[in-house]
């Protein structure tokens, strides 16, 4: 039996906020790059869900990428933790995403890191 004891949920913006308006992002290729990076680290199964979010009185769509991992398996296989892959990807692509912060969930915690 395999027990996946760690849950990660990565918040992927589909819009940027500029000049007092929401502008849809064209991130299909960039998002495919994240999927490839996660796959390269051995994270082959995940869920992608489109949700409606609210922030600073603005309503917008975002993607939630959810994956469950086994901490023991990650350690045994010397895999990079998925949050490290996500953080690196987000910082490398923030010229496209143009966000002030990124957010992800790990188990029962929400982590938000400023990019400014």
Roles of regions detected by a PLM:
Residues 1-116:
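Positively charged, small/polar-rich N-terminal and surface patches that mediate targeting and assembly
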